[in-house]
Amino acid sequence: FLTHDHHDHTAGAVELAQRSGAPIYGPKLEMGADTSGGTFKVDYLLEEGLLYPFEGAPIFEIYKLPGHSSDSLGILLSEEQLMFVGDVVFRHGPTVVFHPDGNLADYLASLDLLEDLVNLGKVNVFCPGHGHPIVDPLRSIRATRNHRIERLDQVKQALAAGVSRDADSLFDAVYEGVDEHLRWASLRSIEAQLVYLDSEQSEGL
């Protein structure tokens, strides 16, 4: 099962399928565009709202969770109240909104959807694509949302103070203390924030 089309999730899919004989399920028919091995076709397309029963295994239900990427999705094991959330939420800290494919408005809406699923009692545990399971999902959702809004406010303040409207300048002004090796990923999120602010301004006119 592939939750989204990023190389750290798709790179070994074909080899694993060949060795195990297992089919590949994914959110797009063709995946792996950013891997050195090139693209590959999935065996089955994961579509929102569909139930995927397997003999002797739990039933999976699919939810679209765009934002980190446009194709991100969650895989819910209803009976276990457990959801694989890909890179949408982590226990150890925030994820990246990968502009231009990722979108901050979509990401915040996906957090709202996850919060609703938890409040409805459909999910008790998140299993992210990196790190440990999240056994207190509401806390992680709210911490993640608060972080994104705080960063957005910091970008607004930096722009108001005269910082140049480009991602590199804003990184230097806002992301003080963030390790330099995270610059590239942070720049993607900053660009997504700028798009969000432009949209917010347009809607306010």
Where is each model-derived feature located?
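Short, solvent-exposed loop/turn segments at secondary-structure boundaries
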Residues: S36-F40, V96-H99, R139-S140, L182-W184
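Metallo-beta-lactamase
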Residues: I59-Q154
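Aromatic/hydrophobic pocket-lining residues that form the small-molecule binding cavity
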Residues: T10, Y107, L111, I190
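C-terminal regulatory/interaction regions
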Residues: Q157-L205
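Residue-level signal for inorganic ion chemistry
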Residues: L16, H130, V155, L197
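Short, leucine-enriched amphipathic alpha-helices that occur as contiguous helical runs
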Residues: A22, R148, L152-K156, L187
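Active-site HxH/HxHxD metal-binding segment of metal-dependent hydrolases
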Residues: F1-P58
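Histidine-centered divalent metal-coordination motifs
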Residues: T3-H9, H68, H130, Q193
